[in-house]
Amino acid sequence: LLQKIVQDQRALIEKDTGKPAGEVPQVWALYKEVQGYYEKGMRVPDDVLLLWCDDNWANIRRLPTPEERARPGGAGVYYHFDYVGGPRSYKWLNVTPIPKIWEQMHLAWQYDAKRMWIVNVGDLKPMEVPIEFFLTYAWNPAAWPAERLPEYLRLWAAREFGAEHA
């Protein structure tokens, strides 16, 4: 039934855009139960981007296999800095250290899950440091090897508060 729904959606895309569905960017977020459907064999066309998700605790649940990396749609990651849900919510407080973000997004980069990165940030103010690191790393992962992570925080603090307070 779900695969029929995907086929119907693609037909609607073609009807509404006048283009073949494969020429219109599409994403399938493998979040929570949807990843379970995928693991049990549900598939979408190869031109659809597979968006791998974290476990709501900053651990990417799964990354693409070599066969999945060969799909023309590619792969990406949906990541959380803010989460509301069971068994515990975390808001208004940064609970994801920069090294953890680096580790997980570095894995995503190594496994070619880099076509799209989305981060759920919740409230912006308490997440300034992780948001900026996430975007900086996404822009140029090679510029930020693990050895430079302490330098990142020093540079950020110097810019925000002055070198004497960094």
Stretch-by-stretch model annotation:
Residues 1-72:
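Gly/Pro-rich turn-and-neighbor structural signature
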Residues 54-58, 64-166:
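Structured mid-domain segments that build the active-site/substrate or prosthetic-cofactor binding neighborhood
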